[in-house]
Regions:
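Surface-exposed loop and turn segments in beta-propeller and other repeat-based domains
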Residues: 1-8, 48-63, 94-114, 150-161, ...
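Signature of short aromatic-glycine-proline-rich micro-motifs recurring in repeat-based ectodomains
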Residues: 7-14, 62-68, 83-84, 110-122, ...
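Residue-level detector of Asp-centered blade-edge/turn motifs that repeat once per structural unit
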Residues: 17-20, 70-75, 123-126, 170-174, ...
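Conserved beta-propeller blade signature
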Residues: 21-25, 77-80, 88, 128-132, ...
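Short glycine/acidic-enriched loop and turn motifs that connect beta-strands
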Residues: 29-33, 85-87, 136-138, 183-185, ...
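Short loop/turn segments immediately following beta-strands, especially the blade-tip
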Residues: 47-49, 92-97, 145-149, 189-199, ...
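Blade-level signature of beta-propeller repeat domains, shared across WD40, Kelch, NHL, RCC1
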Residues: 237-239, 318-352
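Glycine-centered coil/turn sites that cap beta-strands in beta-rich domains
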Residues: 352-384
Length: 390
């Protein structure tokens, strides 16, 4: 079904979901250029939308928002990156702080202008916030859980003016994956769990094309699945790095995934530009594309389960710009070129216990032939449905 009413704008750039909250930010969809689009934050909670359109107007360069993230230890705290205005910190829907070059190690695009271009964000296991800072010398910044900052230079990546570090992923082994889209690079950074000691850090460059069947030129998105594998959305389909704890000891290669469709074997979505990938509670992949709509892919990526586009569904547009999934309800939020949609999937995240177990309908009458929904289960639980006699 659709989420209505929705956010203040139909130009949705990024979506964050945590617990039962969803945060949506506006964006012009300009990937690297300045568009001066006013930023806004919209919150969906308790089946209602709330927003404060003028919340950012008193701050420097509150335009061209890029990403949004909840603090996993405090759902009332939200961080937002901006392609011009650094990083904003929001508490209880109020902007309380802006991080720029004057009050943090974040760097300006000097000498061209004093904009601070930030994009990707991710929290690590110690609740340190990792941020990509483009068009400057040190492309990686860390705001520690203590509030102190750290600035890190990445090898393999030129610090020339204009270089872009876009997205960052912190995986289950606490390694950081940073995308450098313009030069088609993917950097893996391991701080060896000694954040303040830069001398023991290990950095590797992922070889995106040598072991792949399709040569790609640009990385658009990156996500880790429930098996620890890294899925990479590119300009020509999807590639995967099969992750492991000793990954940093060997060369790292990305590979294509074979899928059999209509009797033919081909590389997964090799003709599509992949804009976003979301992993649901069943480890399936929801894949957004630039012009072909939305795909649901099996856990391994070898089977296409469903396809949604303007012709066969209520999808607003075949251009999918961003997605995220509510881990509690399983609702998939889809940002299209024509606005935001919500789709209720049939898979949510496993719970830590059975305290919120729900069955609908309950009781199930003998004449009922529809779907039975069971929610609030633990991961990998076995569910059996019987009649009163067992």
């Amino acid at each position: 079904g659709f989420v209505k009413p929705g956010p203040r704008t139909d130009k949705v750039g990024a979506i964050a979901c945590f617990e039962e909250k969803t945060a949506v930010i506006s964006n012009s969809q300009e990937r690297y250029n300045y568009s001066y689009t006013p930023g806004s934050l919209n919150i969906f909670a308790n089946e209602e939308w709330s927003y404060n359109y003028n919340a950012f107007t008193e701050f420097q360069y509150p335009w061209d928002f890029r990403n949004v993230i909840f603090n996993p230890q405090n759902s009332a705290e939200i961080f937002i990156t901006s392609w011009m205005g650094g990083v904003f910190r929001v508490e209880n829907n109020v902007v309380v702080e802006q991080f720029m070059s004057e009050n943090s190690p974040l760097e300006e695009y000097y000498p061209h202008n004093n904009y601070v271009s930030t994009s990707g964000m991710a929290f690590d296991k110690a609740n340190n916030l990792w941020i990509t800072n483009s068009k400057c010398g040190n492309l990686l910044k860390v705001r520690k859980a203590s509030g102190d900052w750290l600035s890190i230079q990445l090898p393999y990546v030129s610090s020339e003016e204009g270089v872009v570090a876009e997205w960052i992923l912190v995986d289950r082994y606490n390694k950081k994956w940073i995308t450098i889209p313009r030069s088609n690079k993917l950097v893996v950074y391991d701080d060896n769990n000694t954040l303040d000691n830069l001398t023991d850090d290990i950095v590797r460059l992922v070889d995106l094309n040598s072991a792949a069947n399709v040569s790609t030129q640009q990385i658009n998105c990156i996500v880790e699945d429930k098996n620890g594998n890294i899925w990479i959305g590119t300009d020509l389909g999807i590639k995967i790095v099969y992750n492991s704890s000793n990954l940093m000891k060997n060369p790292i290669y990305a590979k294509n995934i074979f899928i059999t469709q209509d009797g033919y074997t081909q590389n997964l979505l090799e003709h599509e530009s992949i804009t976003c990938i979301v992993v649901d509670g069943a480890n399936r992949k929801w894949v957004g594309t630039a012009r072909a709509g939305l795909f649901l892919i099996s856990e391994s990526g070898t089977e296409e389960i469903a396809k949604f586009n303007e012709s066969n569904s209520l999808l607003f547009s075949n251009q999918i710009n961003a997605m995220n999934i509510n881990p509690v309800t399983g609702e998939l939020f889809i940002a299209t070129a024509s606005g935001l949609m919500g789709y209720r999937t049939d898979a949510s995240e496993g719970r830590e216990d059975y305290s919120e177990l729900k069955v609908f309908p309950n009781p199930v009458r003998e004449s009922y032939t529809g779907i039975i929904s069971v929610s609030g289960m633990m991961e990998n639980a076995l569910c059996k449905i019987t009649d009163a006699n067992g």
